[in-house]
Amino acid sequence: MTLLKSYYELCKPNVVYMMLICAFVGMLLAEESVKSFSYLLVALTGIAFCAASAAAINQVIDRKTDASMTRTDQRPLPQGELSVTHASIFALTIGILGATILFLYVNILTMALTLASLIGYAFIYTVYLKRATPQNIVIGGLAGAAPPLLGWASITNSIDPYALLLVLIIFVWTPPHFWALAIYRKDEYAKESIPMLPVTHGVVFTKLQIVLYLSLIHISEPTRQEAISYAVFCL
């Protein structure tokens, strides 16, 4: 793996791409005058840099745990392709760059929300929640559900109830997604003393929670004019 690719993988690109798609949908659904393509690109770039920074910080903090788990042992830090110092400097640099872009060319609200999401995932979830409670992904999932709100705020410079609805959809979907993975990797999480729900409450209970959370998605279904927007977002 080349050095450039190592830094690229440090950013968890697939996760960042999905976040950008959700942010872009938030932009499209915002009820404001259409912004130029260049503006959208700049806003998405700022969000992308901050998301990549959060992912890199997560890998720096979790490097020892990653090295002992099959799912993550091929990441750049466990493989020794990057030093902790270089990875940390890289994460800090792109985080500052992303925040600066949002501050100068988008708006302060989007910058603040994006930084809150970064801190929520990289520090509150990774450092504390992940190892503190089996509800880690329920609480920490809010940071990962933020992209539609970030995209919406970049267009309207406001927090709209419809944007929060989009956040709610992802927020409710996130725990079942991670719990399904945790069931598959249950033994690895147990070995690292990470209290994922299947480890602390068993597989049967976790499957029940998955069903219950998926059923909650119906609560976030919109009515009337919002139905089309909801369908577009889900697609």
Predicted regions and their residues:
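Alpha-helical transmembrane segments of integral membrane proteins
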Residues: 18, 38-46, 86-90, 109-113, ...
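Single conserved hydrophobic/aromatic residue that forms the stacking wall/gate
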Residues: 217-235
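Functional transmembrane core segments of multi-pass inner-membrane proteins
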Residues: 32-35, 141-182, 186-187, 203-204, ...
